[in-house]
Amino acid sequence: MARNFELSLILFVLYLSTAAIVMARNLEEESSGDTEFIKASCETTSYPDRCFQSLSSYASEIKKQPRKLAETALAVSIARAKSAKTYVSEMTDYKGITKRQHEAVADCLEEMGDTVDRLSNSLKELKHLEEGDSGEDFWFCLSNVRTWTSAALTDETACMDGFGGKAMAGELKSLIRTHIVSVAEETSNALALINDFASKH
């Protein structure tokens, strides 16, 4: 009797172990597939390495969904834009800043504020789209998303326009440019993924 119980217990433990291994393997394969989806999608962007680096950690949430991928790309762009905006605002107190540089920083700060607003509007609009819908409302909303995201990219470019010319060259410009370029690349990638999502409808 005791031997039968021990045998049953051993078999039960083996069953649980096998089930756990199979489940872990399935999850690993699913995760790998999700990651490959992101990698393949990022190849359609202008900055695929940055795209994959920024989005691969969200693979389990994205799960091969083009819309979710575009939403996540926008969310990443917003976070990067907010960070850049904060950084630019701190540069108004940069040591030795000239009047012209101060004006350029102020203009850039305004442009980054617009960038955050436009990207936030894009994300909200994208989330309002109905799954499976491809009617006029869908394309109208998607047009808004594209327009706002493109405008955000223009704002980011305009931010650096104020630092044009040799007189504006130097460390301040270089420091700000590093942050703005990062945002612009994320935004460009987000726009490409939005277009990729649109092409599937």
UniProtKB/Swiss-Prot annotation:
Subcellular localization(s) per the UniProt record: Secreted, Extracellular space, Apoplast; Secreted, Cell wall
Cited InterPro entries: Invertase/methylesterase_inhib, Pectinesterase_inhib_dom, PME_Inhibitor
UniProt GO MF annotations: pectinesterase inhibitor activity
Tissue-level expression: Accumulates in etiolated hypocotyls (at protein level).
UniProt site positions, description: Required for pH-dependent PME3 binding and subsequent repression in acidic conditions: 110
Effect upon mutating residue 110 to A: Strongly reduced ability to repress PME3 in acidic conditions, at pH 5
Signal sequence, renumbered to the chain: 1-24
Site label Involved in pH-dependent PME3 binding, positions: 85, 103, 114, 118, 125
Domain of life: Eukaryota
Single GO cellular component term: plant-type cell wall
Biological processes per GO annotation: negative regulation of catalytic activity; shade avoidance
Record Pfam families: PMEI
Protein purpose: Pectin methylesterase (PME) inhibitor that can target PME3 in a pH-dependent manner, mainly in slightly acidic conditions (pH 6.0 and 5.0) but not at pH 7.0; this processus relies on changes in the protonation of amino acids involved in intermolecular and intramolecular interactions. Regulates homogalacturonan methylesterification during plant development.
PANTHER family linked: PECTINESTERASE INHIBITOR 7, PECTINESTERASE INHIBITOR-LIKE
Stated family: Belongs to the PMEI family.
Subunit structure: Binds reversibly to PME3 to inhibit its activity; the stability of the PME3-PMEI7 complex and the inhibition of the pectin methylesterase (PME) activity is pH-dependent, based on protonation status of amino-acids at the complex interface.
Protein name in UniProt: Pectinesterase inhibitor 7
